[in-house]
C-alpha cells in the first residue's frame, strides 16, 4: 500500500469542479473509493426521512470528492502543492510540500 499523501485534518484546495478554488479541511479519507470528505466543499442537499432522533426534511451535507480534484495547501502560502516524502535522521518519514520545501507534518 502506498503512503497517504492526503490525510484527515489536512487543509486542501479544490482543483476542479464547481467548488474550484475553495479550501477546506479533510474530515475523512475513503482510500478504497479514492475520495475524501472536505468541510464546506461539494455540499449536496439530501432528503432525510423523519426518525425518532432526527427531524425530517432537506438537509445539506458534504459529498465525497475525488482525490485527483484536490491538492494539499502549501503551509507557507496556502496555494495548492504536490506532496513528496522525506526521511529524517531519526528514521521518520514526513510529508513535504514540493512547492516550498516546507514540512506538512512532523
From Swiss-Prot:
Q: What's its job?
A: One of two assembly initiator proteins, it binds directly to the 5'-end of the 23S rRNA, where it nucleates assembly of the 50S subunit.
Per its UniProt record, what InterPro entries does this chain match?
KOW, Rib_uL2_dom2, Ribosomal_uL24, Ribosomal_uL24_CS, Ribosomal_uL24_KOW, Translation_prot_SH3-like_sf
Stored NCBIfam families: rplX_bact
Protein's recorded name: Large ribosomal subunit protein uL24
Q: Quaternary arrangement and interactors, per the entry?
A: Part of the 50S ribosomal subunit.
Q: Does the keyword GTP-binding apply?
A: no
Per the record, its GO cellular-component terms are: ribonucleoprotein complex; ribosome
Keyword Ribosomal protein in record: yes
Its BP terms in the Gene Ontology are: translation
Organism of this sequence: Azorhizobium caulinodans (strain ATCC 43989 / DSM 5975 / JCM 20966 / LMG 6465 / NBRC 14845 / NCIMB 13405 / ORS 571)
Superkingdom as given in the UniProt entry? Bacteria
Any one GO MF term held by the record is: structural constituent of ribosome
The record's family statement is:
Belongs to the universal ribosomal protein uL24 family.
List the PANTHER family.
Answer: MITOCHONDRIAL RIBOSOMAL PROTEIN L24
Gene behind this chain? rplX
Amino acid at each position: 500500500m502506498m503512503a497517504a499523501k492526503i490525510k484527515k485534518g489536512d487543509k486542501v484546495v479544490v482543483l476542479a469542479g464547481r467548488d474550484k478554488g475553495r479550501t477546506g479541511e479533510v474530515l475523512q479519507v475513503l482510500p478504497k473509493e479514492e475520495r475524501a470528505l472536505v468541510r464546506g466543499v461539494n455540499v449536496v442537499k439530501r432528503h432525510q426521512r423523519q426518525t425518532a432522533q432526527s427531524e425530517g426534511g432537506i438537509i445539506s451535507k458534504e459529498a465525497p470528492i475525488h482525490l485527483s480534484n484536490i491538492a494539499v495547501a502549501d503551509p507557507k502560502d496556502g496555494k495548492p502543492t504536490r506532496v513528496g516524502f522525506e526521511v529524517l535522521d531519526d528514521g521518520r518519514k514526513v510529508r513535504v510540500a514540493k512547492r516550498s520545501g516546507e514540512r506538512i507534518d512532523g
